[in-house]
Amino acid sequence: RPPRSTLFPYTTLFRSYSAKALATLLLDECVRLYGGSPGDDTTVGVIKIREREQVNLMIGPPSDPKDLNKMMTLFFSKGGKHIVCGGTTSTLTGQFLGKPVIPCLDYISPDIPPMATIEGVDIVTEGVITISKVLDYAKDYLGENKLYDDWTILQDGASCIARMLFEDATDINFYVGRAVNAAHQNPNLPITFNIKMQLVDELSKCLK
């Protein structure tokens, strides 16, 4: 058994890694040591003990504008990180906080709409397209995990949300407004534009 002094640098180095990421690294190293052709079974079990970290995600304003202040107050009364998704939701959030919504144009993705910043909010993104991509990442994460190298490195809105939900959060609260976005009712647009609630429900099930 190695002395504690030699273990400490490793515990510090890998502290930010998720249990699944550590297990994957160990399995990959075993495959490497076997020269790419494992001669026996390899089993890795990883348990990560950590403090609870709450993340709150809001997408869409309420159907009744009179409920907006109540929704915003409840959302920002929760501790932890705050994610705001959707153009209208971001604008209303900026008005509620009395802060400008500043578009981020330093990182452009061909697939995901640009992010923005609002003082007091950790992540600000577009709505349905971004959450659809997060759901794709979540399904893959529970399966073959082939997209891990994408969302852990890329700086688009979907990747930033995925990192926060999959690797940082222990408790996640969703705030889903039921206001109808007229732009999403075009029958020529992909069906995912019409199922915001279903997207969030599927994502919630994946996270559980």
Describe the predicted segments one by one.
Residues P2, L33, K78-G79:
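Alpha-helical hydrophobic/aromatic positions enriched in membrane-embedded helices and signal peptides
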Residues T11-T73, K99-P103, Y107-Q185, L189-K208:
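C-terminal catalytic subdomain
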Residues K66, M71-L97:
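Active-site beta-strand/loop microenvironment that shapes enzyme catalytic pockets
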Residues R4-S5, S18, G36, C85:
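Short, surface-exposed helix-loop/turn micro-motifs enriched in polar/charged residues
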Residues R1-P2, T6-L13:
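Short, small-residue-biased leader/transition segments that mark boundaries at the very start
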